Amino acid sequence: MRRIATLVFLSFGLLLAALTWFQVLGADRYRSDPRNVRTAINISGKERGLIVTSDGTVLAQSNPDPDDPQAYLRVYPEGPTFAHVVGYTSRLVGESGLEAAYRDELRSRRDLTISDVIAALFGRDLRPENVLITIDAELQRAAVAALEGQRGAVVAIEPATGAVLAYVSSPTFDPNSFLGPSAVSNRQAVLDDPNEPTRDRAGTELYPPGSVFKAVVAAAAVESGFAGPETTFDDPVVYELPGSTSTIGNADGGPCGDGVTVTLQTALVRSCNTVFASLSVTLGASAIGDTASSFGFDRRIDFPWTLAESTFPVSDLANDPAALAQSGIGERDVRVTPLQMALVAAAIANDGEAPQPYLVSQVFNADGEAREVAEPRLIGRAMSPATAVVLQQMMERVVTSGTGQSASITGVRVAGKTGTALPEPGQPDVWFIGFAPVDAPQIAIAVMLEDGGPLGESGTGGSVAAPIAGALMERYLVRGETG
């Protein structure tokens, strides 16, 4: 009898320990697990906190369900404009974006579980918290409109802090359609769209950068002391790839200058493929790779969701000068995200310091009190301040007298670099990166359009991406002066 009593006692002890683990110690872990059916059900019906922009625009909110006084309906007032940033949360199709990344902060804890009751007894606020983001709503809307009908991306960053001012992937989708009883069929329709609107082209897709990568190569050349803006290079019509019968030519089919020599400054202004291909081989893969890494290449950049890593594969290029020459002009093996190239522009604008991009500036409670406040951080120093000044001056010349003139803004000093990459014949990815004003940078930007944008195979970075970038920077700067 004593043995039976002991077994019963031990059984109750184990049961109590298990309940304590699941209901108290392990509650948060199991509650946040997406496989938890109860969590999935609660996502759609429980109150969630606000997601708000820096200028007070509400992007996500929970409204009382008119059919169920105990439930709430999630609503996205800006719909497609912020879809890739805010994401969605749905019992039927899951979650994405900030809704997923800040799941724990945004959700209500008033579930009346044992752990919630205990937390409330100790004074914990069980109401949902709210998320304040750095995006400028008007700039975001303007960027979405600029890319309407096209496949591409715009990323804008405040150079001194890394605050993300715009994060746009086009085409987009309406996250409101992923809510309610038709969520599954609506999401499937979006997934079946050949333009792939759910793809995050701004931060999770990789592209050849074309000639915007020449800014990185130029930085490597100047920082190493190998060249300055007035250093001269041979100016051939074509560059013969080492160990190959293939050649690289310039966009117009001729030399960049007089056909004898050309300066580094002019080579960047006119985007000379021949000069930068040769320069890349001379510098070597390691030197370029080190500079690229200091901008954020080949490393994980902290962000609310996992970004694709931009790559400059040093080990693959170190013993392949032909591939290095092609990669040095932004083709072949180098791949980037638009966010990464916005960081390149931001680092040059920020006197050589590459800012850590951040999207959430603050998490605040239901009483409006800040619980978490973002502190600007750096990825690292990409170049010395002196080198940054040289790059700023050379890139300003690109806009005043080179391939980026369509990005110019009346009365504002603008710096930039154009790019046109050819991942497939007749399907150019067109680019512009830049910043303004040069003397006191407030915005750095990257614009990329697939397939030449509205001009198709005749599109270039200068004709398509640069005017979009210029217009968006002007809109932001002018409003800043008047607002």
Residue spans of the language-model regions?
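Beta-lactam-recognizing serine transpeptidase/beta-lactamase-like catalytic domain environment
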Residues: A160, V164-S211, V216-D451, G461
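Periplasmic/cell-envelope proteins involved in peptidoglycan metabolism and beta-lactam response
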Residues: M1-N186, P194-D200, T204-S211, F226-T231, ...
